[in-house]
From Swiss-Prot:
Family listed: Belongs to the FIS1 family.
Domain commentary: The C-terminus is required for mitochondrial or peroxisomal localization, while the N-terminus is necessary for mitochondrial or peroxisomal fission, localization and regulation of the interaction with DNM1L.
Cystine crosslinks: none
N-acetylmethionine carried by residues: 1
Sites bearing Phosphoserine, chain numbering: 10
The species this protein was found in: Rattus norvegicus
Membrane-traversing stretches: 123-143
Protein name as annotated: Mitochondrial fission 1 protein
Cytoplasmic side: 1-122
CDD domains recorded: Fis1
């Protein structure tokens, strides 16, 4: 599963699917499969703007898809949001998938990895906030010391 989350699309694949998508768009009608393939490539890009664009395309597809297609759309929406560190959104999608398919092992594993990432980022976030609080307290102490020395 971690391979799926960390896999990067090749520039060549991205350009090929982008060309196909734009060609169909120019002709006035983009097929669901073309839009999904392009979105799937974008979600695996190393650029956050591409990932966001892929998420938008997947969200557009969601109401149009069959049950099987929707499962894929929701899964890659979770993957895209995970890659953007939008863990709450990623969890929303993966838990929605697990409601309809409680035995989906891929979704269970993705949920576990999202929870793990949230805990890791949460601890890092708390450490940063704690460090900032110590820094502010230290600065206040130094200012207090300087003020008291200047009065002496």
């Amino acid at each position: 599963m971690e391979a799926v989350l960390n896999e990067l699309v090749s520039v060549e694949d991205l350009k090929n699917f982008e060309r196909k998508f734009q060609s169909e768009q120019a002709a006035g009608s983009v097929s669901k499969s073309t839009q999904f393939e392009y979105a799937w490539c974008l979600v695996r890009s190393k650029y956050n703007d591409d990932i966001r664009r892929g998420i938008v395309l997947l969200e557009e597809l969601l109401p149009k898809g069959s049950k099987e297609e929707q499962r894929d759309y929701v899964f890659y929406l979770a993957v895209g949001n995970y890659r953007l560190k939008e863990y709450e959104k990623a969890l929303k999608y993966v838990r929605g998938l697990l409601q309809t398919e409680p035995q989906n092992n891929q979704a269970k594993e993705l949920e576990r990895l999202i929870d793990k990432a949230m805990k890791k980022d949460g601890l890092v976030g708390m450490a940063i906030v704690g460090g900032m609080a110590l820094g502010v307290a230290g600065l206040a102490g130094l200012i207090g010391l300087a003020v008291s020395k200047s009065k002496s």
